[in-house]
Amino acid sequence: LRNPSLYELYGSDNYGIGGNTKLNPEKSETNELYGEYNFSETIKFTSTAYRAKVFDRIESNAAYSKHENELIDINQEGLESELLFSGNNQNVGLYTNFSKSRKANGQAQSRRPDLSYGANYSKKINSSIYGPFNLNLNYKHTGQFIDYDGSKNSRQKSTDLVDLSIKKNWFGNTLSINLTNLLNERYEKPATYSQDGRQLKVGFNKVY
Protein backbone atom coordinates (compact mmCIF):
# COMPACT_ATOMS: atom_id res chain seq x y z
CA LEU A 1 0.00 0.00 0.00
CA ARG A 2 1.38 3.43 -0.95
CA ASN A 3 -0.51 6.53 0.08
CA PRO A 4 -0.45 9.57 -2.24
CA SER A 5 2.34 12.05 -1.56
CA LEU A 6 1.61 15.68 -0.61
CA TYR A 7 2.75 16.70 -4.09
CA GLU A 8 0.32 14.27 -5.73
CA LEU A 9 -2.50 15.51 -3.50
CA TYR A 10 -1.92 19.27 -3.47
CA GLY A 11 1.13 20.17 -5.58
CA SER A 12 1.63 21.57 -9.07
CA ASP A 13 4.58 21.95 -11.44
CA ASN A 14 5.74 24.10 -14.35
CA TYR A 15 3.81 21.97 -16.83
CA GLY A 16 0.46 22.49 -15.14
CA ILE A 17 0.15 19.02 -13.60
CA GLY A 18 -1.89 19.65 -10.46
CA GLY A 19 -2.76 17.70 -7.35
CA ASN A 20 -5.87 15.63 -6.76
CA THR A 21 -7.31 15.24 -3.25
CA LYS A 22 -9.55 12.36 -4.40
CA LEU A 23 -6.67 9.97 -5.08
CA ASN A 24 -6.81 6.45 -3.67
CA PRO A 25 -3.71 4.66 -2.32
CA GLU A 26 -1.76 2.45 -4.71
CA LYS A 27 -2.02 -1.26 -3.96
CA SER A 28 0.24 -4.13 -4.98
CA GLU A 29 0.64 -7.91 -4.74
CA THR A 30 4.17 -9.33 -4.74
CA ASN A 31 5.69 -12.82 -4.86
CA GLU A 32 9.40 -13.22 -4.10
CA LEU A 33 11.93 -16.06 -4.21
CA TYR A 34 15.15 -15.43 -2.25
CA GLY A 35 18.37 -17.43 -2.33
CA GLU A 36 21.70 -17.10 -0.55
CA TYR A 37 24.92 -19.09 -0.93
CA ASN A 38 28.13 -18.73 1.07
CA PHE A 39 31.12 -19.78 -1.01
CA SER A 40 33.36 -19.22 2.01
CA GLU A 41 33.52 -17.09 5.15
CA THR A 42 34.45 -14.10 3.00
CA ILE A 43 32.39 -14.57 -0.18
CA LYS A 44 28.59 -14.56 -0.30
CA PHE A 45 26.08 -14.46 -3.16
CA THR A 46 22.44 -13.40 -2.77
CA SER A 47 19.65 -13.22 -5.33
CA THR A 48 15.96 -12.30 -5.27
CA ALA A 49 13.48 -12.97 -8.08
CA TYR A 50 10.15 -11.20 -7.84
CA ARG A 51 6.87 -10.69 -9.65
CA ALA A 52 4.38 -7.98 -8.70
CA LYS A 53 1.14 -6.38 -9.84
CA VAL A 54 0.26 -2.76 -9.01
CA PHE A 55 -3.37 -1.59 -8.84
CA ASP A 56 -4.75 1.97 -8.75
CA ARG A 57 -1.33 3.33 -9.65
CA ILE A 58 -0.94 7.11 -9.45
CA GLU A 59 0.21 8.92 -12.60
CA SER A 60 -0.55 12.13 -14.49
CA ASN A 61 -3.55 11.84 -16.80
CA ALA A 62 -3.38 11.89 -20.61
CA ALA A 63 -3.87 15.67 -20.69
CA TYR A 64 -1.06 16.18 -18.11
CA SER A 65 -3.42 18.34 -16.05
CA LYS A 66 -3.55 16.39 -12.77
CA HIS A 67 -2.68 13.10 -11.06
CA GLU A 68 -5.18 10.26 -11.27
CA ASN A 69 -5.57 6.60 -10.34
CA GLU A 70 -5.02 4.71 -13.59
CA LEU A 71 -7.36 1.88 -14.57
CA ILE A 72 -4.58 -0.01 -16.37
CA ASP A 73 -2.55 -2.15 -13.95
CA ILE A 74 1.25 -2.47 -13.89
CA ASN A 75 3.00 -5.84 -14.13
CA GLN A 76 6.53 -5.96 -12.72
CA GLU A 77 9.13 -8.72 -12.62
CA GLY A 78 12.84 -8.78 -12.04
CA LEU A 79 15.99 -10.33 -10.63
CA GLU A 80 18.24 -8.59 -8.08
CA SER A 81 21.63 -10.18 -7.36
CA GLU A 82 24.69 -9.25 -5.31
CA LEU A 83 28.14 -10.79 -4.81
CA LEU A 84 29.88 -9.75 -1.59
CA PHE A 85 33.58 -10.05 -0.71
CA SER A 86 34.90 -9.21 2.77
CA GLY A 87 38.21 -9.45 4.57
CA ASN A 88 41.41 -7.54 5.37
CA ASN A 89 39.38 -4.57 6.69
CA GLN A 90 37.63 -4.09 3.36
CA ASN A 91 34.34 -4.99 1.67
CA VAL A 92 33.45 -5.21 -2.03
CA GLY A 93 29.91 -5.58 -3.35
CA LEU A 94 28.95 -6.14 -7.00
CA TYR A 95 25.26 -5.96 -7.85
CA THR A 96 22.89 -6.15 -10.82
CA ASN A 97 19.19 -5.37 -11.11
CA PHE A 98 17.23 -6.64 -14.09
CA SER A 99 13.65 -5.40 -14.02
CA LYS A 100 10.68 -5.19 -16.32
CA SER A 101 7.80 -2.87 -15.53
CA ARG A 102 5.03 -2.76 -18.11
CA LYS A 103 1.45 -1.58 -18.23
CA ALA A 104 -1.20 -4.19 -18.98
CA ASN A 105 -1.31 -2.84 -22.55
CA GLY A 106 2.43 -3.50 -22.99
CA GLN A 107 3.71 0.07 -22.63
CA ALA A 108 6.80 0.68 -20.48
CA GLN A 109 6.28 2.40 -17.14
CA SER A 110 7.83 5.87 -16.88
CA ARG A 111 11.12 6.34 -14.99
CA ARG A 112 11.74 2.60 -14.58
CA PRO A 113 14.97 1.46 -16.27
CA ASP A 114 15.21 -2.21 -17.24
CA LEU A 115 18.83 -2.47 -16.09
CA SER A 116 21.06 -1.08 -13.37
CA TYR A 117 24.31 -2.38 -11.92
CA GLY A 118 27.17 -1.15 -9.82
CA ALA A 119 29.80 -1.72 -7.18
CA ASN A 120 30.42 -0.60 -3.61
CA TYR A 121 33.85 -0.61 -1.98
CA SER A 122 34.75 0.25 1.61
CA LYS A 123 38.06 -0.01 3.43
CA LYS A 124 39.40 0.83 6.86
CA ILE A 125 42.83 2.42 6.43
CA ASN A 126 45.43 3.00 9.13
CA SER A 127 47.84 5.68 7.92
CA SER A 128 51.13 6.41 9.67
CA ILE A 129 50.52 10.11 8.97
CA TYR A 130 46.74 10.62 9.34
CA GLY A 131 45.87 7.67 11.55
CA PRO A 132 42.80 5.47 10.97
CA PHE A 133 40.04 6.54 8.59
CA ASN A 134 37.33 4.98 6.41
CA LEU A 135 37.18 5.16 2.61
CA ASN A 136 34.02 4.46 0.59
CA LEU A 137 33.72 4.32 -3.20
CA ASN A 138 30.38 3.73 -4.95
CA TYR A 139 29.59 3.28 -8.64
CA LYS A 140 26.13 2.92 -10.21
CA HIS A 141 25.05 2.53 -13.83
CA THR A 142 21.40 3.28 -14.57
CA GLY A 143 20.08 2.24 -17.97
CA GLN A 144 17.84 4.21 -20.29
CA PHE A 145 14.23 4.84 -19.31
CA ILE A 146 11.08 6.53 -20.62
CA ASP A 147 10.05 9.93 -19.21
CA TYR A 148 7.97 12.96 -20.22
CA ASP A 149 10.27 15.72 -21.54
CA GLY A 150 7.69 18.52 -21.69
CA SER A 151 6.30 17.63 -25.11
CA LYS A 152 6.24 13.83 -25.32
CA ASN A 153 7.43 10.62 -23.69
CA SER A 154 11.04 10.10 -24.78
CA ARG A 155 13.92 7.78 -23.91
CA GLN A 156 16.36 9.33 -21.44
CA LYS A 157 20.11 8.66 -21.49
CA SER A 158 21.83 6.13 -19.26
CA THR A 159 24.06 7.43 -16.47
CA ASP A 160 27.27 6.34 -14.72
CA LEU A 161 27.68 7.93 -11.29
CA VAL A 162 30.67 7.60 -8.96
CA ASP A 163 30.81 8.93 -5.39
CA LEU A 164 33.83 8.95 -3.07
CA SER A 165 33.84 9.66 0.66
CA ILE A 166 36.49 9.69 3.38
CA LYS A 167 35.53 9.77 7.06
CA LYS A 168 37.73 10.07 10.12
CA ASN A 169 36.97 9.97 13.82
CA TRP A 170 38.63 12.94 15.52
CA PHE A 171 38.34 13.09 19.31
CA GLY A 172 34.85 11.56 19.16
CA ASN A 173 33.74 13.76 16.27
CA THR A 174 33.52 12.88 12.57
CA LEU A 175 35.40 14.69 9.82
CA SER A 176 34.30 13.90 6.27
CA ILE A 177 35.28 14.71 2.68
CA ASN A 178 32.72 13.81 0.02
CA LEU A 179 33.15 13.91 -3.74
CA THR A 180 29.83 13.32 -5.51
CA ASN A 181 29.38 12.69 -9.24
CA LEU A 182 33.13 12.23 -9.58
CA LEU A 183 32.91 11.74 -13.37
CA ASN A 184 30.96 15.02 -13.71
CA GLU A 185 28.07 13.27 -15.47
CA ARG A 186 25.55 15.69 -17.01
CA TYR A 187 22.02 14.34 -16.83
CA GLU A 188 18.40 15.10 -16.03
CA LYS A 189 16.35 13.11 -13.53
CA PRO A 190 13.44 13.38 -13.91
CA ALA A 191 13.51 14.73 -17.46
CA THR A 192 13.95 18.55 -17.69
CA TYR A 193 15.39 18.67 -14.12
CA SER A 194 19.18 19.02 -14.40
CA GLN A 195 21.21 17.38 -11.64
CA ASP A 196 24.41 18.70 -10.10
CA GLY A 197 27.78 17.94 -11.65
CA ARG A 198 30.90 17.13 -9.65
CA GLN A 199 30.79 18.53 -6.12
CA LEU A 200 33.19 18.60 -3.17
CA LYS A 201 31.74 18.79 0.33
CA VAL A 202 33.61 18.93 3.63
CA GLY A 203 31.71 18.05 6.80
CA PHE A 204 32.18 18.10 10.56
CA ASN A 205 29.83 16.24 12.88
CA LYS A 206 30.21 17.04 16.57
CA VAL A 207 28.83 14.66 19.17
CA TYR A 208 27.56 16.11 22.45
Task: Please describe what each predicted stretch is.
Residues L1-E32, F45, A49-E70, N138-G150, ...:
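Surface-exposed extracellular loop regions of Gram-negative outer-membrane beta-barrel proteins
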Residues I17, K27-E29, N75-E77, L115, ...:
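Residues that act as N-cap/strand-start positions at coil-to-secondary-structure junctions
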Residues G19-P25, G35, H67-D73, E80-E82, ...:
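Outer-membrane beta-barrel proteins
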Residues N31-L33, A108-Y208:
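Conserved C-terminal beta-signal and adjacent last beta-strands/turns
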Residues E41-V54, S60-A62, N69-D149, G203-N205:
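Gram-negative outer-membrane beta-barrel transporters
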